[in-house]
Amino acid sequence: MIINARSFGEIEIEKEDIITFPDGIPGFEGLKQYIIINNPDEENPFQWLQSVDNGDLAFVIINPFLIKPDYDIVIPQSAIDKLKIEDKKDVFLYALVVVPKKLEDMTVNLSAPIVINGKEKLGRQI
């Protein structure tokens, strides 16, 4: 499957790599399918959560433990149920990065992480 992403041009993705956000992401509730695009520079910790439905929408994300090694979050039982999480090894956490015009003003949202069940390919911002 090929999608046209504004920041990346045409990229080929596999259907099995698509992560479904059943409720969308707050502010983008109508967009439910995303893929994670890894940074080609392995030294760069940023990745992208690219909408499959809208090529113009991609969120910069980062592993929150790279920012705050003692990061601790409790995933509500309702999210565990909706994401069909059965084993914590299937859970991946990401934080949204806010990238303003002045890069030195960049912030990371540790209060509302993205939780992904890698086994079921389901995601949710909590």
Predicted regions and their residues:
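Short active-site loop/helix that positions an aromatic residue
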Residues: 77-87
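Long, compositionally biased stretches
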Residues: 2-68, 88-126
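Extended catalytic/binding region for NAD+/ADP-ribose chemistry, centered on the ART fold
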Residues: 70-75
